[in-house]
Design a protein with these regions (language model features):
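Acidic, metal/ion-coordinating pockets
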Residues: 1-139
């Protein structure tokens, strides 16, 4: 089983239009796209919520977010699995987390590391391909 792991994906700032237009191919080199297509699963650490929430949570440091339409590009990653356990997922509070989960569920994207409640947040995720199985846990 081939797995790619990508960290700190933030579909905002200078690349916002490519993500919201679904043009992820403009952001990735040919060689990297080949590697993505060669993997059964591509695990992405989504380093921000996908939300329209405008009020950031009270915290020290920058608050990151991306538009829900960013999923147009992200869903083009084959075998996409999203990790949400990171220091920016709550930058726009609980609403930002819930909005992100809703977008992922609407697109049938498996995720881990956050949830609608504690039970869902603490669940593991089992990925299976043919005779191979791998368990993931992120908190």
């Amino acid at each position: 089983m081939k797995i790619m792991i990508m960290s700190d994906v933030v579909p905002a700032a200078s690349a916002k239009n490519e993500y919201t237009d679904g043009a992820i191919e403009k952001l990735l080199s040919d060689g990297f796209r080949e590697k993505l297509h060669g993997a059964e699963f591509n695990i992405v650490n989504l380093e921000c919520p996908l939300t329209r929430e405008n009020e950031p949570a009270a915290k020290w440091g920058s608050s990151l977010k991306a538009l829900p339409e960013s999923m147009k590009a992200l869903k083009k990653i084959p075998g996409l699995v999203v990790n949400l356990a990171n220091n920016h997922i709550r930058d726009y509070g609980s609403q930002g987390v819930l909005d992100t989960i809703q977008v992922l569920e609407e697109h049938g994207i498996p995720y881990l590391g956050a949830g609608k409640d504690m039970e869902n947040s603490n669940r593991s995720l089992i990925l299976e391909k043919k005779s191979h199985k791998i368990g993931l846990y992120s908190c």
